[in-house]
């Protein structure tokens, strides 16, 4: 019985030595993961074994090769995903925004239609249209500012100013602090990004990258 027990222990030791010395890279990755998790326990209180496995798989990937192997369709999917994720983060109610915009555009189109049929309406009706026309245009501009790219472009300009005046490292520190200060949004976005990268779902990968950017944009409101 003791010999059997010693044999079992010997097998276990051989396995452990092989794991440490022959697969040193994998072991160091696992240890790094554990240290990272311990260090970021407050930030990631609900981290799972699947998250750890995704991180390990991503660390083994050659991301440069993945980028080089992306097809034109993959790049398009990534771009569409980034746009969708950014729109989702910057504007949390896109359907409501788009519906309001569509209603305003319909109203504007109706004004143009009525003016083009000027002789079919009375002078008083035309004067009324002229009076409300500036208001409709103003509402359109307001909605375009809220739903369109103007807000995004302005904030990209602010980030570019940080990089130009303070350097890339300062922007990286700013981005890290901005992301870490939003753990409620950061955790599910990070989890989705890891899963999308492992499965090579480029459109969803783009969505999560866009959500990351949205977190940065939303944190820059001062």
UniProtKB/Swiss-Prot annotation:
Which residues does UniProt assign to the signal peptide? 1-22
Places the protein is found: Secreted
Keywords per UniProt: Glycoprotein, Secreted, Signal
Presence of the UniProt keyword Lipid biosynthesis in the record: no
Give glycosylation sites per the record: 25
Q: Where are the transmembrane segments?
A: none
Assigned protein family? Belongs to the Sct family.
Q: What is this protein called?
A: Secreted protein D
Encoding gene, per UniProt annotation:
sctD
């Amino acid at each position: 019985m003791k010999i059997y027990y010693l044999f079992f222990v010997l097998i276990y030791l051989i396995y452990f030595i092989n794991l440490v010395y022959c697969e040193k890279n994998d072991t160091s990755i696992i240890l790094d993961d554990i240290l990272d998790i311990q260090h970021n326990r407050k930030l990631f209180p609900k981290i799972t074994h699947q998250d750890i496995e995704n991180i390990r798989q991503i660390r083994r990937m050659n991301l440069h090769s993945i980028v080089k192997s992306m097809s034109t369709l993959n790049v398009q999917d990534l771009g569409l995903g980034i746009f969708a994720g950014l729109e989702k983060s910057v504007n949390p109610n896109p359907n409501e925004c788009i519906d309001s915009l569509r209603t305003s555009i319909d109203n504007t189109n109706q004004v143009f239609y009525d003016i083009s049929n000027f002789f079919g309406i009375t002078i008083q009706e035309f004067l009324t249209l002229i009076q409300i026309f500036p208001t409709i245009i103003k509402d359109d501009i307001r909605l375009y500012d809220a739903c369109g790219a103007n807000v995004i472009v302005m904030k990209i300009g602010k980030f570019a100013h940080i990089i130009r005046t303070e350097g890339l490292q300062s922007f990286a520190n700013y981005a890290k602090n901005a992301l870490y200060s939003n753990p409620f949004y950061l955790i599910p976005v990070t989890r989705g990004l890891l899963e999308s990268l492992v499965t090579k779902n480029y459109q969803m990968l783009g969505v999560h990258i866009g959500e990351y950017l949205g977190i940065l944009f939303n944190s820059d409101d001062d």
